[in-house]
Curated annotation (Swiss-Prot):
To the N-terminal part of insect vitellogenins. Keywords: Metalloenzyme inhibitor, Metalloprotease inhibitor, Protease inhibitor. GO terms for molecular function: peptidase inhibitor activity. This is Ovary-derived ACE interactive factor. ACE hydrolyzes Neb-ODAIF by sequentially cleaving off two C-terminal dipeptides. It comes from the Eukaryota. It comes from Sarcophaga bullata (Grey flesh fly). The lineage of its organism: Eukaryota, Metazoa, Ecdysozoa, Arthropoda, Hexapoda. Substrate for angiotensin converting enzyme (ACE) in vitro.
Length: 11
């Protein structure tokens, strides 16, 4: 799935 900014910030 495509990551949203709210998801990739967790990296």
């Amino acid at each position: 799935n495509k990551l949203k900014p709210s998801q990739w910030i967790s990296l």
